[in-house]
Regions:
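Short, active-site-adjacent cap segments at secondary-structure transitions
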Residues: 30-32, 55-56, 126-128
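Generic beta-sheet signal
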Residues: 116-124
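Glycine-rich phosphate-binding loop signature in dinucleotide/nucleotide-binding domains
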Residues: 16-19, 109-117
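Active-site catalytic microenvironments for nucleophilic, acid-base chemistry
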Residues: 12, 37-41, 108, 112, ...
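Active-site-proximal alpha-helix that buttresses catalytic centers in soluble enzyme cores
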Residues: 1-45
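Domain-level recognition of soluble alpha/beta enzyme cores
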Residues: 135-160
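Phosphate-handling substructures
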Residues: 40-101, 157
Length: 160
């Protein structure tokens, strides 16, 4: 399903006549493969792996079923329409830390690609914090009011 979604995304980008100068991706397999499929379909060079695009470190929640989130993390959770977010499990990256990482991504892209359009293939939580940083929206508001699914296009967002 993921590869099919990536091919559909590439068609959608072509249909919208979006043009990208570079593609960056999380080094994790699924996001990187998605970026590679899209880059190839668009005639772009291979994606560049960028460690700051990796998904949030979930600490003790890593590998646990979503159903366990409330039991383990309550009351430090935020429930949104499609997702429950845990805020402070042991060893996890906090959303303020993730927001700072999102800002680092934007700063890096602005330095490396001034006046260019860059496609980022990343994961949900870091994607939301990049969006929060780019739009100066409070991170809690982004978690509750903003949702994007696999291979959704968010943007373009001008960060110059």
């Amino acid at each position: 399903m993921g590869r099919q979604q990536a091919r559909q995304l590439a068609r959608h980008i072509k249909d919208r006549e979006l043009v990208f100068d570079a593609v960056y991706a999380s080094p994790l397999d699924r996001a990187f493969e998605t970026a590679a499929i899209v880059a190839t379909a668009l005639g772009l060079t291979e994606p560049i792996a960028h460690d700051d695009l990796i998904e949030r470190d979930f600490g003790i929640m890593t590998g646990k079923p979503a159903a366990d989130i409330e039991a383990i993390c309550a009351p430090d959770i935020i429930k949104a329409e499609n997702v429950t977010y845990f805020l402070h499990p042991d060893g996890a990256e906090t959303f303020p830390e993730l927001l700072a990482r999102g800002q680092r991504v934007l700063d890096f892209m602005t330095r490396q690609h001034p006046d260019q359009t860059v496609l980022l293939a990343c994961h949900g939580d870091i994607g939301k914090m990049i969006y929060a940083a780019a739009t100066s929206t409070p991170w809690r508001q982004v978690l509750t009011d903003f949702y994007f699914g696999n291979t959704d296009i968010v943007g373009p967002v001008d960060v110059s």
